[in-house]
UniProtKB/Swiss-Prot annotation:
This is Aspartate/glutamate leucyltransferase. Keywords: Acyltransferase, Cytoplasm, Transferase. The lineage of its organism: Bacteria, Pseudomonadati, Pseudomonadota, Betaproteobacteria, Burkholderiales. Belongs to the R-transferase family. Bpt subfamily. Pfam families: ATE_C, ATE_N. Its EC number is 2.3.2.29. It comes from Cupriavidus pinatubonensis (strain JMP 134 / LMG 1197) (Cupriavidus necator (strain JMP 134)). The gene is bpt. The keyword ATP-binding does not apply. It catalyses: N-terminal L-glutamyl-[protein] + L-leucyl-tRNA(Leu) = N-terminal L-leucyl-L-glutamyl-[protein] + tRNA(Leu) + H(+); N-terminal L-aspartyl-[protein] + L-leucyl-tRNA(Leu) = N-terminal L-leucyl-L-aspartyl-[protein] + tRNA(Leu) + H(+). GO terms for biological process: ubiquitin-dependent protein catabolic process via the N-end rule pathway. SUPFAM superfamilies: Acyl-CoA N-acyltransferases (Nat). GO terms for molecular function: arginyl-tRNA--protein transferase activity; leucyl-tRNA--protein transferase activity. It is found in: Cytoplasm. Functions in the N-end rule pathway of protein degradation where it conjugates Leu from its aminoacyl-tRNA to the N-termini of proteins containing an N-terminal aspartate or glutamate. The keyword Nucleotide-binding does not apply.
Length: 266
């Protein structure tokens, strides 16, 4: 019998969900293509799926599979060529003092409290601000791949030493890091925690000697997702090919629908 790590992508099955309300674009319906069974999706297989445009939520591995909309475009940063712009350099200077601790996925009550505060202030009414502990754990702390939790705190000796500012979940792939989810202190109005987190992940990807930081989906029409285009050079996946992001050349209107999982042209 083949070992799990040797099983090919063809051992998986893919099915489409029923339509549901899109969480990114108001008034639209969405569908997802789901990869199963979950126990066959180890770190190696998941790396290939991410290159084909998939993401995960807990042990649920999926990608957009909508009937008429192709607004969700997978994107990744070429970390060796990345140069921060002026506002990104300011964010790094503002938050570079934070102390980062990388750990396995673990439940911490302090993290959960910050998550609820973040959801209540940044995504009120979206449903996630009412997540129970079980829902939080299923969403962020369950994984069958190589995942890490990173917490960012004020350093010793600072006025608010030890204060939790941000928590980020990342997956380690064979060709980079994948940014899973991030939540942070929403009471700091002049902070740029989200930008700093991506800059930190870019630096970590470089230090690991890996070429890509996967940022999930870029959605031109979604204010929550459009910020990803600021991290250049950026590549986007259209059909089965990764290509350079161009403001006028790749958009929600031109992005191709996903093909069946298969070889991806790098």
């Amino acid at each position: 019998m083949s070992k799990l790590k040797e099983l090919p992508l063809s051992a998986l099955q893919f099915y489409a969900t029923a339509p549901y309300a899109c969480s990114y674009l108001d008034g639209r319906m969405a569908r997802s293509q789901v990869a199963t069974p979950a126990h066959l999706i180890n770190a190696d297989v998941y790396s290939r799926l991410v290159r084909a445009g998939f993401r995960r939520s807990g042990i649920f591995t999926y990608r957009p599979y909508c009937d008429e909309c192709h607004a969700c475009t997978p994107c990744r940063v070429l970390v060796e060529q990345f140069e921060p712009d002026r506002s990104q350099r300011r964010a790094w200077r503002r938050h570079g003092h934070l102390q980062a601790l990388v750990a396995p996925l673990t439940y911490v009550e302090e993290h959960y409290s910050l998550y609820l505060l973040y959801q209540s202030m940044r995504h009120a009414g979206g449903g996630m601000d009412q997540d129970s502990r079980d829902q939080y754990e299923q969403f962020l702390l369950q994984s069958r791949v190589n995942s890490r939790l990173v917490e960012f705190r004020e350093p010793p000796g600072s006025p608010e030493a030890g204060k939790l500012r941000m928590v980020s979940m990342i997956d380690v792939l064979d060709d980079g890091l994948s940014s899973v989810y991030t939540f942070y202190d929403p009471l700091e109005r002049n902070a740029s925690y989200g930008t700093y987190n991506i800059l930190w992940q870019i630096r970590q990807t470089r230090e690991l000697g890996l070429p890509h930081l996967y940022l999930g989906y870029w959605i031109a029409e979604s204010r929550k997702m459009a910020y990803k285009a600021r991290f250049r050079p950026l590549q986007v996946l259209t059909g089965n090919q990764w290509q350079a992001f161009e403001d006028d050349g790749v958009s929600a209107a031109t992005a191709a629908p996903p093909d069946e999982p298969g070889p991806v042209q790098e």
